[in-house]
Regions:
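A beta-strand edge to alpha-helix "cap/lid" segment located at domain peripheries
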Residues: 4-7, 21-55, 59-149
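Bacterial N-terminal signal peptides
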Residues: 7-16
Length: 149
């Protein structure tokens, strides 16, 4: 009986240690995705179309606040043509959920910029889906909604 209690205690201890490691790993991945979100926003302002190649997957599906669905090629064209001009992006309240090699990030973005000459300044809510492929995190889906204030 004493051996059974010892074995059960060791088993429970190993489970709690494993759970702690999983929580630590998840927290680290959440921080990594938050950093990628910040980097993507900054790169879009500084690098324009070059940021698309770095952060967007080839098969991305993106929906803008008007409901227009775009892909990587269209996003690059919008930025390189000057149709989409971003002066600043300020992310806040970014929350991340990890699902194995997939992460979902949601937050707020204060944008200053124009699209085809129209002012798009404002507060937006976003949801981005990141997938880790070949050791690299990239966005496969992105959706922005303008917050009505």
């Amino acid at each position: 009986m004493k051996n059974l209690l010892t074995i059960a205690s060791l088993w429970l201890l190993s489970l709690s240690l494993a759970a702690g490691q999983d929580a630590s790993k998840t927290s680290s991945l959440e921080d990594q995705i938050k950093k990628l979100e910040q980097n993507w926003a900054q790169a879009t302002v500084k690098e324009g179309a070059a940021a698309v190649d770095q952060y967007e997957a080839d098969d991305i599906i993106a929906t803008d606040p008007s409901g227009r669905v775009t892909n990587k090629t269209q996003d690059k064209l919008d930025l390189s043509s000057g149709d989409f001009k971003i002066q600043s992006e300020e992310l806040s309240d970014v929350r991340v959920r990890i699902y194995s090699n997939t992460a979902v990030a949601s937050g707020t973005n204060i944008v200053k910029g124009t699209y085809k000459g129209q002012d798009i300044n404002g507060k937006y809510r976003f949801t981005d889906t990141w997938v880790k492929r070949n050791g690299k995190w990239q966005v496969v889906a992105s959706q922005y909604t303008k917050v009505q204030e």
